């Protein structure tokens, strides 16, 4: 078998965010709030906006809200930025509120995917929206990025539209849509936006803004990392790129004849009835006469014949528009290995939209290739055809953006945020704590984000796809400045910082030991199936940050509200002791997600043994500190790869350890996640994809309301409402031995007269007594939203009345 040589990628570098000349003079200065109306623009002395950001969230000028980060980042570049937040989408008029932008519209659905924000995992409409004043639902349309782009085009048809945010980011290629149960086209094609920016887009949006300000047509901006755009069939600008065709699976590879070491090249050619004369003549051609790319690497590779792709299949057979030069490979005479063309000029052709829509195997294959090309150090561009014949278009996805440096992270987070919702949301008393309170802002009001990214790689999570695996950390000084700003400026601060974390609590300043190895790595996770030996797990910088933060004047307590990666934490007992002794407010959130190997392997999560090791350390250090503290584990029901027996074993583990879930999170197939590909295809993209059932790994999928309800019932085994369903299921599973009234049984034989879930619709004319905040052992919350749990029905803790068995 011939191997393919790949050179180690050099450390990444990019133009600094602060290296651009400001577009406007500094005389304007930062705005107290980015304007949301013509009147506010007039107060700032503006006659127009350079950029108008349209968002599905209410405008909160805080570094945890995407529109504020992008708006303030562009403002620091000298651009005049306006905000249109949660506009009425029934007409184009609200999109004209700030006039015609000079450069572009920036469109985003907000901090959350609009479909996940509006619908539960069971496809039921939510009654609330945490990113809207008063928590009211219905303030944004379904797939609001699409709707907003259409209205912006209707308002000002000649203004470029740049699409961003997590909703668009996770829909940049053809994707499975859980709500319609079908594969949809790239949002770039459906929306007809000019550019799509994916991931954290500060670097990309700054470059795009400055190039548009120089009057460069948006159609020519095709070389910015972290962007996607549409190429037509007749576009010749990609002629100097080299295309690797990955649009099929299980195609036979090329057979190479074994080389006779005792024959020269001329003798071998003569034995085959050919001659080396042409090859020798080609090698003697001056570089000025070589065709584009034909000898960039000399003998290492050559262009294929016209219309032929890297795997030997003719492009015409697929009806492809060949916008890049296909390549074939030959072994190097020095190493005997196949060599690829330069990665920075290589594009991989994914299966087309029409292919992945009708072929589950190709969908899983495309998902696998996409996730293998996510490391900024070695990722290649991707292209996916949408449409056929003369209407065919290519969605071209450039490699991911270069991660921000610590200095750049400090620049972004040190911008002059007001750290408050816009004054237009205040109540009659000018407060944001009344009926117009924005729940999402309330959650992060006194919290500090210290880093971005996550190298955990959990297959059900979108953080890695959006923010990347490389951790981008702020400096200690920048974090301390923000804490002091909260202390001195934010109304209602009582001395408690509610969170000092990020996507994960304990990945601050943790990185690969070698930037060269990091740039060449293609693993989807640094901690699964075990912690990579190249990962530096030193928690000392985080410990120093904790100690400095809690020593600040006026700061009484620093809590850690972000989820903890416990398999990483146990590598540093000193960190666990520091955390448990000083930074736990009674409960600490961790996410084992399950206890059984089947679902855990599909989630890429560590085994329950890692949880047990952390639990022992947690209890030991809590006892040494003289504190009564508990862990809150998160679990998911109905994840791909979960059998009914797996959920039964999880329920037994929960009962044995005294855990009772207040709420249950059912697996939610979000666009582009690996677990979603499993859900749609019944295949495991973590393994090789093949049409051969002996080579491809099938995944058990929990579909249908009845089975999903059963898996949720196992998580809430203590809820009497679920006992009839569980009894029936246990009997079918041959586990009737778990039905009984002893401690070793899972559920009893009797049924209480009342279940405790009924609530009278009649309004009570009395106020319930205040409930004490005493800690309860065994309390778990399995909602992954990060928002306050909805205390409804049986989740309120009503205890059913017991009925004696007959």
Show the residue positions of the predicted features.
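Glycine-rich beta-alpha loop elements in corrinoid/cobalamin-binding modules
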Residues: 58, 66, 85-284, 297-390
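Amphipathic alpha-helical packing elements
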Residues: 187-199, 713-757
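Acidic, low-complexity intrinsically disordered tails
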Residues: 2-20, 273-281, 311-326, 750-806
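Catalytic cores of alpha/beta
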Residues: 575, 640-655
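Flexible glycine/acidic-rich beta-alpha junction loops that bind and position SAM and/or redox cofactors
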Residues: 113-122, 170-172, 199-210, 231-239, ...
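N-terminal pre-triad scaffold of radical SAM enzymes
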Residues: 54-59, 426-462, 496-498
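Terminal amphipathic helices with adjacent charged low-complexity linkers/tails
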Residues: 90, 219-236, 351-374, 392, ...
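Conserved SAM/AdoMet-binding glycine-rich loop
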Residues: 53-56, 69, 83-84, 88-89, ...
């Amino acid at each position: 078998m011939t191997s393919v040589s790949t050179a180690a990628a050099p450390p990444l570098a990019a133009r600094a965010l602060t290296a651009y000349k400001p577009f406007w003079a500094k005389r304007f200065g930062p705005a107290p709030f980015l304007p949301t109306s013509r009147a506010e623009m007039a107060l700032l002395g503006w006659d127009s906006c350079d950029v108008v950001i349209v968002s599905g969230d209410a405008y909160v000028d805080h570094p945890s809200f995407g529109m504020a980060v992008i708006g303030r980042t562009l403002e620091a570049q000298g651009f005049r930025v306006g905000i249109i937040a949660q506009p009425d989408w029934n007409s184009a008029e609200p999109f004209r509120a700030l006039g015609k932008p000079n450069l572009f519209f920036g469109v985003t659905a907000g901090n959350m995917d609009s479909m996940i924000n509006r619908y539960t995992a069971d496809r039921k409409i939510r009654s609330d929206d945490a990113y809207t004043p008063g928590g009211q639902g219905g303030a944004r349309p379904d797939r609001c990025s699409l709707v907003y782009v259409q209205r912006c085009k209707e308002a000002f048809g000649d203004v470029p539209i740049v699409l961003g945010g997590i909703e668009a980011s996770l829909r940049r290629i053809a994707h499975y849509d859980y709500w319609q149960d079908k594969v949809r086209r790239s949002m770039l094609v459906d929306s007809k936006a000019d550019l799509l920016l994916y991931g954290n887009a500060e670097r990309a949006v700054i470059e795009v803004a400055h190039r548009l300000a120089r009057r460069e047509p948006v159609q020519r901006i095709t070389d910015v990392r972290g962007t996607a755009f549409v190429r037509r069939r007749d576009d010749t600008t990609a002629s100097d790129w080299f295309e690797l065709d990955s649009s099929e699976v299980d195609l036979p590879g090329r057979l190479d004849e074994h080389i006779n070491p005792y024959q020269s090249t001329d003798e071998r050619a003569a034995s085959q009835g050919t001659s080396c004369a042409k090859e020798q003549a080609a090698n003697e051609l001056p570089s000025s006469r070589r065709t584009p790319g034909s000898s960039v690497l000399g003998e290492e590779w050559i262009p294929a014949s016209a219309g032929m792709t890297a795997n030997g299949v003719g492009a015409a057979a697929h009806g492809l528009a060949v916008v890049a030069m296909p390549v074939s490979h030959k072994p190097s005479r020095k190493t005997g290995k196949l060599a690829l063309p330069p990665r920075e000029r290589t594009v991989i052709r994914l299966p087309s939209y029409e292919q992945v829509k009708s072929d589950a195997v190709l969908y899983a294959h495309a998902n696998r290739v996409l996730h293998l090309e996510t490391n900024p150090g070695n990722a290649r561009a991707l292209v996916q055809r949408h449409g056929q014949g003369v209407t065919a278009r290519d969605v071209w996805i450039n490699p991911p953006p270069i991660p921000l440096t610590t200095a750049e992270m400090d620049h972004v987070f040190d911008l002059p945020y007001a750290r408050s919702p816009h004054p237009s949301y205040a109540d009659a008393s000018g407060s944001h704590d009344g009926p117009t309170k924005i729940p999402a802002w309330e959650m992060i009001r006194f919290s500090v984000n210290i880093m971005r990214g996550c190298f955990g790689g959990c297959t059900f999570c979108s953080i890695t796809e959006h923010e990347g695996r490389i951790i981008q950390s702020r400096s200690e000084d920048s974090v301390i400045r923000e804490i002091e700003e909260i202390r001195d400026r934010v109304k209602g601060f009582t001395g408690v910082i509610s969170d000092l974390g990020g996507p994960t609590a304990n990945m601050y300043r943790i990185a690969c030991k070698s930037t060269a190895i990091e740039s060449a790595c293609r693993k989807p996770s640094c901690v699964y199936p075990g912690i990579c030996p190249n990962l530096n797990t030193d928690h000392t910088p985080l410990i120093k940050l904790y100690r400095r933060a809690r020593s600040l004047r006026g700061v009484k307590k620093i809590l850690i509200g972000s989820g903890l990666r416990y398999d990483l934490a146990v590598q540093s007992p000193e960190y666990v002791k520091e955390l448990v002794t000083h930074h736990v407010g009674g409960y600490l959130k961790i996410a084992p997600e399950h206890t059984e190997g089947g679902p855990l392997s599909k989630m890429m999560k560590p085994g329950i043994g890692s949880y047990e090791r952390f639990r022992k350390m947690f209890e030991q250090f809590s006892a040494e500190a003289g504190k009564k503290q508990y862990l809150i584990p998160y679990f998911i029901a109905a994840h791909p790869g979960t059998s009914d027996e797996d959920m039964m074993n999880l329920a037994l583990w929960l009962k044995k350890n005294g855990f009772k879930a207040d709420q249950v999170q059912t697996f939610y197939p979000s666009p582009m996640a690996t677990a979603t590909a499993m859900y749609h295809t019944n295949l495991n993209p973590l393994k090789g994809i093949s049409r051969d059932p002996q080579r491809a790994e099938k995944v058990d999928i929990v579909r249908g309301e009845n089975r999903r309800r059963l898996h949720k019932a196992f998580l809430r085994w203590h809820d009497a409402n679920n006992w009839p369903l569980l009894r029936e299921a246990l009997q079918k599973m041959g586990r009737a031995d778990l039905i009984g009234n002893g401690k070793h049984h899972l559920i009893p034989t009797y049924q209480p007269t009342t279940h405790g879930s009924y609530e009278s619709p009649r309004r009570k004319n009395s106020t319930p007594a205040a409930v004490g905040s005493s800690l309860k052992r065994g309390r778990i919350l399995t909602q992954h939203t990060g928002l306050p749990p909805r205390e409804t029905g049986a989740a309120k803790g009503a205890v059913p009345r017991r009925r004696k068995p007959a």
